[in-house]
Regions:
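A compositional/biophysical signature of low hydrophobicity enriched in polar/charged and small residues
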Residues: 1-78
Length: 78
């Protein structure tokens, strides 16, 4: 499994709704609310060889009230 993170900017007042939709979809490993330019930080795992760009485009960015995303690819956990 390959881990990666997505920072999500939501439409105003919609952060909790987006977090709940992500949780209901059962595609995220962990979901955190954050301060700063983005509202949520979400950890995902995909199978080796999965196209992360397509996953984010088709599974994450299609959730209503998501305004913007930033994907963070990680190399190694310590």
């Amino acid at each position: 499994m390959v881990p990666f993170f997505v920072q999500i900017k939501c439409h105003l007042g919609k952060s909790y709704e987006v977090a709940n939709k992500l949780a209901d979809a059962e595609i995220a490993s962990e979901i955190y609310s954050t301060a700063g330019d983005f509202d949520l930080l979400v950890k995902f795992y995909v199978e080796d060889g999965t196209d992360i760009g397509h996953f984010v485009n088709e599974k994450v960015q299609t959730i209503p009230d998501i305004q913007d995303t930033r994907t963070i690819i990680t190399f190694k956990a310590f």
